[in-house]
Amino acid sequence: STQIEATNKVIQITGDGSDVDFDLTHDFGTKLVSVEILDYGNDGSGATYATVHADVTRPDDAYVRVIFAVAPSATQDYMVLLKKFTV
């Protein structure tokens, strides 16, 4: 069996009503990064913490790109949970 080590980071996305792409720098040094996006309401107010589905790409070893189909409004925030894996 292989032991897997993990490192975590949490980043908040704040909508502005126009941007659909968000580059999130993690500096983990790898593309082996798990990404989960949670509904965080309006800076936590009214947050459901439900998983939100969006496209995620890993352009390089330092960041991930989250791409929403529709731009989040200025009153909608998301909490992005990032986990680095080392195999």
PLM feature segments, named:
Residues 1-87:
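Extracellular attachment/recognition segments
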